[in-house]
């Protein structure tokens, strides 16, 4: 397994992430996959600019929504890096399943392809995308219907991006959720990243907090 889960890369610089991508290829070919169609191309253009700032210029857009190209998707495994962008993870999950991306990502995970996932894209690789629903629903509602929102499950914990921007009341909901849903939640500040080499084990850079059964526990080892 070769996964990097981040809060906002490349919008916040992270040398460790850049180094891992460069280790995959000197001039990596990167598949940029958003949750839904980028109608005016603005998101892709901005992503290209940000990746260009760290000298990655071979960025290709893969649409899994309105302009789905199954032939293009069939060659996903040929990219050096697969990048799952930010966005609504509930919609991302729906489109990934509908387009067949979810199955292809599972294959890429099992074959050790490098996948970099940010924010909503990172949630797609966890067991469930229900953390996002806490923004608009109660803990009780989210837990009661959590079974309908299972995701790829490449890692065993759920991920909360942008924890440095969250209000205390929302963090309290996440702590309750971790207890009532019986799941670990790993919270990432902007600029942080997890480097997952197996379903349960990761190293990290930046500020990372782990919640378990409603409590804050120690995180795993820092990456070099």
What residue ranges belong to the model's regions?
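C-terminal and late-domain segments of enzyme folds
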Residues: 1-26, 38-49, 81, 131, ...
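N-terminal small/polar loop signature for handling phosphorylated ligands or for N-terminal nucleophile
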Residues: 70-81, 93
């Amino acid at each position: 397994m070769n996964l990097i889960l981040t809060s906002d890369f490349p919008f916040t610089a992270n040398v460790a992430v850049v180094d891992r991508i460069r280790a995959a290829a000197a001039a990596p070919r990167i598949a940029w996959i958003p949750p839904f169609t980028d109608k005016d191309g603005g998101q892709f253009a901005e992503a290209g600019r940000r990746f260009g700032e760290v000298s990655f210029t071979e960025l290709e857009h893969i649409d899994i929504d309105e302009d789905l190209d199954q032939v293009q998707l069939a060659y996903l495994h040929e990219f050096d890096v697969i990048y799952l962008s930010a966005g609504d993870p509930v919609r991302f999950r729906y489109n990934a399943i509908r387009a067949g991306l979810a199955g292809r990502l599972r294959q890429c995970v099992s074959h050790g392809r490098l996948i970099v996932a940010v924010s909503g894209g990172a949630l797609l690789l966890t067991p469930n995308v229900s953390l996002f629903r806490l923004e608009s629903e109660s803990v009780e509602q989210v837990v009661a219907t959590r079974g309908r929102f299972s995701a790829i499950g490449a890692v065993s914990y759920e991920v909360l991006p942008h924890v440095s921007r969250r209000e205390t009341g929302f963090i309290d909901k996440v702590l309750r959720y971790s207890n009532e849903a019986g799941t670990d939640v790993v919270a990432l500040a902007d600029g942080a990243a997890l480097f997952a080499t197996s379903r349960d084990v990761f190293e990290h850079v930046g500020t990372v907090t782990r919640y378990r059964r409603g409590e804050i526990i120690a995180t795993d080892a820092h990456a070099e």
